[in-house]
């Protein structure tokens, strides 16, 4: 169909009606609803992940822990990161379009995860008292210890996936800092995360997604896991 002349204002309603008629003829696929009974949650834990400190800058330096950084192409050097929308760092990257990724190595201690994973940058200064940091060429912070390399990213595309945003970025700087192996999620749970006390009676709640322990008899209905950001529905009593 071609419109061969300019559209008059009194013809707009006719065009709307035509557009709606065409839309009605198009087949739309119903959303796929998967049977949750066929999905064993523990199977997802067999996927391998690294652990990273993602840093960005707004009114102040900020960072958070993420576990999803992937190289997409080698030429140009391009990566993707997935960030939970509940994280303050997420909003900073949306606004600025730049970030740094510090790749954590096996020297990273639990205090580092507490600093960047168990508090919000909206209320706390996560870099306060932390000396093992420096600024890259983009002006953002990166770790100089407990990290074997860092990458700087410039966002070229954002993809909305409900609870998370995937940022596609070109790498603008990258540097190797240490030779220690990169930390994986499995290494974190086996060697870094403190083991809960062996008590015979229930004393708290465990996040089924990441294993975080909430100590207390009752879990608030609006509780959000400080590590993986999942809600109370993903906790079970221990």
Which ranges hold each PLM region?
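FMN-binding flavodoxin-like domain, especially the glycine-rich phosphate-binding loop
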Residues: 1-32
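Short, exposed beta-strand "edge-strand" segments with a Pro/Gly-rich flavor and a Y/T-containing core
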Residues: 1-7, 208-211, 226-229
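Short, structured secondary-structure boundary patches
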Residues: 16-23, 123-126, 237
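Basic, polyanion-binding surface patches
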Residues: 28-209, 214-216, 224, 233-234
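Short Cys/His-rich micro-motifs in 6-15 aa windows
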Residues: 228-238
